[in-house]
């Protein structure tokens, strides 16, 4: 946009549309594998069925952790644990959303032992990727 000397700008007649990021682009920005939150229709803990929709994906990704930093941190934590003689460390996850910490832990060779979340969609995403054991 270029401002004119007497006010206004040279692009008064041009309308601008800002494109919303897709859930796939949001997954990539947060460091998740493509399609991580694309779980289709799902059933919550009370047995209620939910249709496939982008809204819970956006919310879950917005409330999630950015994996690159936590990957860096987990690699260093794992090294410290192994340097202290703990060969097979296990770690837990508390309120991380869509399984971000278990994903990071497993990438570092650490066994995630449990995950806790209070919202239904993130619970469903975590169960899809890690099963019922978390």
What are these regions (language model features)?
Residues 81-134:
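Core alpha/beta nucleotide-donor-binding catalytic domains of modification enzymes
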Residues 1-96:
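C-terminal target-recognition/interaction regions appended to catalytic cores
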């Amino acid at each position: 946009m270029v401002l004119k000397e007497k006010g206004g700008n040279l692009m008064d007649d041009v309308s601008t549309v800002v494109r919303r990021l897709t859930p796939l682009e949001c997954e990539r920005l947060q460091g998740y594998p493509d399609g991580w939150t694309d779980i289709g229709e799902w059933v919550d803990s009370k047995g209620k069925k939910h249709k496939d929709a982008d809204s819970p994906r956006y919310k879950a990704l917005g409330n999630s952790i950015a994996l690159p930093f936590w990957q860096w941190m987990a690699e260093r934590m794992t090294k410290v644990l192994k340097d202290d003689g703990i060969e097979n460390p296990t770690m837990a996850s508390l309120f991380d959303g869509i399984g971000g910490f278990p994903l990071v832990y497993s990438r570092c060779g650490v066994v995630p032992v449990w995950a806790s979340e209070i919202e239904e969609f993130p619970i469903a995403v975590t169960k899809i990727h890690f099963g019922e054991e978390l």
